[in-house]
Each structure stands twice: as C-alpha cells, then as structure tokens.
Amino acid sequence: MDKERYQAEYTVLSQRVPENAFRFFNTKGESKRNPYLRIAVFTKSGNLYNLHMDLSSFPASIPPVFVMKMLKDKDGNDLSGTSACMHTLSSEHGWTRICHYGYNDWTPAVSLFKVYVRCHLWLEMYEAHLQTGNPRDYYLKHA
C-alpha cells in the first residue's frame, strides 16, 4: 500500500471508527514488510472482538482477516478450518480466519472500511449462530 492509499484509508477509518479502536502497524520505513491493521469491533450485544487484517498484498489482493482468538461454534467446535456454510477459511496464528470477500467481488478500489463493515456483519451473524444454531450461510447465502 503506497503512502497516498494509506492516508486515504486512515482518513476514512478515522471518520467512521473511533480513533482509539484501530491502529496500523509496519506501514512506514523498513517495517513495511508485514503491514497490518488491528481494529476493534463491538457487536450489538456489546461483545468486543479484535480483528487483525494482513495488509501485505493490499489493495491488489483480498486482505486476510482474523478474529484474534479461536472462535467456537454453537456446539463448542473450533472454527479453525475452511467452512462454506460458516464463511471461514483455514486458520493461522491460532485465530479464526473469516471470509469477507470472494475473489470475483474483489477490486483494488475496495476500502478497508468496507472490509471492516463486512467483518462486523460476519460477527453479528456469528453471534446469531450462537443463539440459534443456524450457520452463517442461513443469514447470508453465497453469491
């Protein structure tokens, strides 16, 4: 991500997300090798989730997004693997990786704020799954 794109992303996020709820890491100087964004999400039920967005190939590629803990489904199983109905991808770092954009939907014009919104919706549907047992796909079908 170049300097101009970083500034645009930072500006949009700071206008729409509390400034103390997100922070970019490794985006300047020599540390640009593994840039990432940490952003907090509060669901309607008041739960806090911390997200880690890997920006190493952003905006050319879909940024991998992880909930910074291993989530469990309603039955207590780890959401660690690829699941079409739960919209998860293979875990890394011991964290649940969520599927927020399909390859056919991705363009370099997609902002980190849009990624954040989709991840927030994913978490709301995850919490609905915990209440009802319905998979995330029940609320939002694949295109």
Per-segment meaning from a language model:
Residues 1-52, 58-143:
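UBC/E2-like fold recognition across ubiquitin and ubiquitin-like conjugation systems
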